């Protein structure tokens, strides 16, 4: 009887652990291209990722020099939404700016 209670307790503890586990996180990465103006990249970082002028400029320079820069870390749905928003905003203004998401 004791082993039945122990296994039930383990099952309950396992379910509680599964419910409280944090969701997987994804980083949104902005990719460099040869056509999008630096000022536009700064504007995107401010508008869609809430960066101030200094942070946005730092990330933009990282993208420019290293080819990529991390805009933020979000749950999957939020990351996907930000990527779609940036793509739509950039395309509407005829810029080829791209973002991707990567698991953290």
Curated annotation (Swiss-Prot):
Disulphide-bonded residues: none
Pfam families: ClpS (PF02617)
Single Gene Ontology BP annotation: proteolysis
UniProt cross-references to Gene3D superfamilies, sorted A to Z: 3.30.1390.10
Domain of life: Bacteria
UniProt cross-references to SUPFAM superfamilies, sorted A to Z: ClpS-like
Function of the molecule: Involved in the modulation of the specificity of the ClpAP-mediated ATP-dependent protein degradation.
Family: Belongs to the ClpS family.
HAMAP family assigned: ClpS
Subunit structure, as described in the record: Binds to the N-terminal domain of the chaperone ClpA.
Name this polypeptide is given: ATP-dependent Clp protease adapter protein ClpS
Organism per entry: Bordetella avium (strain 197N)
